[in-house]
A protein has these predicted regions:
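A structural signal for short beta-strand/turn segments enriched in small hydrophobics and glycine
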Residues: 23, 65-67, 71-73, 102-114
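A residue-level detector for short acidic-glycine micro-motifs
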Residues: 25, 48, 75, 94-97, ...
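Zn2+-dependent peptidoglycan hydrolase active-site motif and core
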Residues: 58-98, 119-125
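Short hydrophobic beta/alpha edge segments that flank linear recognition/processing sites
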Residues: 84-87, 105-123, 144-148
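Short peripheral tails and domain-boundary helices/loops at the edges of structured domains
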Residues: 127-154
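Proline-centered linker/hinge motifs at extracellular inter-domain junctions
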Residues: 148-172, 176
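Long, low-complexity serine/threonine/glycine- and acidic-rich segments characteristic of extracellular
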Residues: 168-330
Length: 330
């Protein structure tokens, strides 16, 4: 997705602007929602060290936040509260605003402070799609304003499993984060029949840790940038299915409970992780549905042996794959 910005400035919204910062909460991560159980994270959480405030920080504030694009302030919470600022394509959340609606701001100009206890600034980005609607997009996608962003670690496809379809309600785990509990009966991939829910566990480890080296329990893999599947009949070599499961350059319309598969856990926020890392797992677990509802109808295929090849990419272009051979017996 290409986007025309108001200027050519590139960098990060916290100092130093020209150096990479660790990101712990990634775009499209699951997040709690009172009405539907869970929705998608609409930005990226750029980490700051609350235990090392910048010089001159006011009480209960830790780091200065800067605009990464020139523009007029479209929204700003009143000073003194944990709120947000909207300028140009970008939203800066969990900040104590230091600008007012209507003001003109240059890229690199301070717009607020991060708030103690949050350990990050949430950076959201919106762009107008082909349909003219403004939607959230991934600020770490190739060609965006956040630069430099380097990730030399390959994403991982850890496991492929087969289940009877199930759509459990989202629950919670320690730290008040969401989880989609295990549900459905696991199937023997040597005897698949009928409707099958194909589930893949995959994630994107980060090669850049920054100050997470000092607090290693805060390091967590990201949501992969892209995932695709190819299904091949092993007897004939025919490709019977090939499709992109998702691409996380923009906000998804698919409900979170169909994008994610049972077994998914949200990444624990930094403040919760610091409290519970000795007794609970901080990183999230990503399980994805390869065929969202109505799932994979094996009755449409001839009986026989097939190979599912799942390929995953990260935002830096690294890729990995995993094969799973199955037998359909309807």
């Amino acid at each position: 997705m290409a986007e025309r910005y108001n200027d050519d400035w590139r960098g990060w919204p916290v100092r130093p602007h020209d150096e990479q910062h660790p990101v712990r909460g990634s775009f499209l991560d699951p997040r709690p929602d009172r009405q539907v159980g869970a929705i998608y994270h609409n930005g990226v959480d750029i980490a700051v060290r609350d235990d090392r405030p910048e010089p001159g920080a006011p009480a209960r504030r830790t780091h200065r936040v800067y605009a990464i694009e020139r523009g007029r302030v479209e929204a700003a919470s009143r000073p003194g509260i944990r709120g947000l600022v909207d300028i140009g394509h970008f939203r800066y959340e969990h900040v104590d605003a230091r600008v007012r609606v209507g003001e003109s701001v240059d890229a690199g100009e301070m717009v607020g402070w991060t708030c103690e206890g949050t350990w990050h600034v949430h950076l959201g980005e919106r762009a107008v799609g082909d349909d003219g609607v403004r939607r959230w997009v991934n600020a770490l996608r190739p060609g965006g304003k956040v630069h430099p962003y380097v990730d030399r670690a390959k994403p991982e496809v850890e496991e492929i499993r087969y289940y009877t379809p199930a759509a459990p309600a989202w629950g919670r785990r320690i730290g008040h984060v969401v989880r989609l509990p295990q549900a459905g009966r696991r199937l023997d991939k040597r005897r698949l029949a009928g409707i099958v829910d194909v589930r893949v566990r995959a994630d994107d480890p980060q090669s850049f840790l920054g100050w997470f080296r000092d607090l290693p329990w805060l390091a967590a893999p990201h949501h992969p940038f892209r995932l695709a599947v190819t299904v091949v009949h092993l007897g004939t070599g025919e490709i019977v299915d090939r499709h992109e499961v998702f691409r996380s350059d923009r906000y998804l319309r698919l409900p979170a409970g169909q994008h994610y598969a049972p077994g998914t856990d949200q990444n624990m926020p930094a403040n919760g992780c610091l409290r519970h890392h000795r007794t609970a797992r901080c990183p999230g677990i990503y399980w994805f549905r390869v065929f969202p509802e109505p799932y994979w109808d094996t009755r449409r295929l001839a009986n026989g042996r097939y190979r599912l090849r799942v390929r995953v990419w990260d935002a830096a272009g690294n890729t990995a794959k995993r094969d799973s051979d199955v037998t359909i017996r309807n």
